[in-house]
A protein has these predicted regions:
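Active-site metal-binding loops of divalent metal-dependent hydrolases
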Residues: 13-14, 54-57, 94, 115-116, ...
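Divalent metal-coordination and catalytic microenvironments
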Residues: 8, 43, 53, 86, ...
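Active-site metal-binding motif and surrounding structural segment of the metallo-beta-lactamase
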Residues: 66-112
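Conserved beta-strand hairpin/beta-sheet module of binuclear metal-dependent hydrolase folds
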Residues: 13-78, 178-192
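Basic, amphipathic N-terminal segments that precede the first structured/catalytic domain
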Residues: 2-33, 250-252, 259-266
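Metallo-beta-lactamase
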Residues: 2, 70-81, 85, 115-168, ...
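Cap/insert and terminal regions of metallo-dependent hydrolase folds
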Residues: 66, 71-74, 178, 184-266
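Beta-strand-turn-beta hairpins that frame and shape the catalytic cleft
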Residues: 2-8, 44-49, 158-165, 183-187
């Protein structure tokens, strides 16, 4: 494996049953079942594993009425990855489903955008409509990591290790960043919540919980430009990811899939 080529995995840890009108600004005339899945991602390279996002735990799932499928720690363990061995964690943004489990990676340095920390600790959090997807304990835990010297801040585009770069997209959250990973198939983009579902970026539609609509829709084209091909942009919450990509190994179907593989059309 070249020093900048990585394997890439999506780990499903949660689920939320909901209908399609809940997933789009303006609703959806079809009004069909359209659930969301919750993922974290493992980026495995010669220098070790980088984790993108940290999910939430069972207690937070109950509080937010989200179903916990399997703990994040177990998903990593299924790939032979020990959580306490992780040295770098990328946080796409500070919403509850992306930055919980804040004690799971005791050795890690956390990478996030300047704008996201400023957003999550500034005047916007005075407004319920904007702070709703944040959990104060998660944000405070990240502030503590700053004071412990365990955070690295990025402004726009930056390299984490050779072959892995972060890119500020914004939109859904002010400091939202997506991740571009060099793989055997070329660059694959982990959109995180820059596109919750394939239907968002493919149809130019917008998830209702949004800080800046313009940044969302402009971001779709940018995600596709960053990838080797439009089909190599992986959305953050789409159950179709588990159908389009193969299981990481036998027995992990519907739980852990390998993303540096050609996706099926389903």
């Amino acid at each position: 494996m070249a020093e900048d080529i990585h394997e890439l995995y999506a780990i499903r840890y949660g689920h939320h049953a909901r209908r399609s009108p809940d997933n789009f600004i303006g609703g959806d005339l079809h009004d069909v079942l359209q659930p969301l899945d919750f993922f974290v991602w493992a980026i495995v390279g010669p220098s070790g594993t980088i984790v993108l996002d940290t999910g939430f735990d069972e207690a937070m799932g109950k509080k937010r009425q989200r179903e916990m499928i399997k703990p994040v720690r177990d998903g990593l363990a299924a790939l032979g990855i020990a959580a306490d061995s992780i040295k770098d964690v990328i946080i796409s943004h500070l919403h509850y489903d992306h930055c919980g489990n804040y004690d799971l990676f005791p050795q890690a340095r956390y990478h996030l955008q300047d704008r996201e920390m400023a957003y999550a600790t500034g005047r916007c959090m005075c407004h319920q409509a904007l702070r709703a997807p944040f959990e104060v304990d998660d944000v405070v835990a990240m502030v503590r990591k700053v004071f412990a010297g365990r955070c690295a801040f990025h402004d726009g585009e930056d390299e984490i290790v050779p072959g892995v770069t972060v890119h500020h997209i914004g939109g859904h959250s002010k400091g939202l960043q997506s991740v571009r990973v060099k793989t055997r198939l070329g660059p694959i983009v982990l959109a995180a919540d820059a596109s919750h579902l394939y239907a968002h970026m493919d149809g130019g539609r917008v998830y209702p919980l949004t800080y800046n609509v313009e940044e969302v829709v402009e971001g779709y084209a940018r995600l596709k430009r960053l990838a080797a091909a439009p089909g190599h942009v992986v959305p953050g919450h789409d159950p179709l990811v588990l159908k389009r990509y193969p299981a990481a190994r036998p027995g992990l179907e519907g739980w852990v899939v390998r993303l540096d593989a050609e996706p099926k059309q389903v």
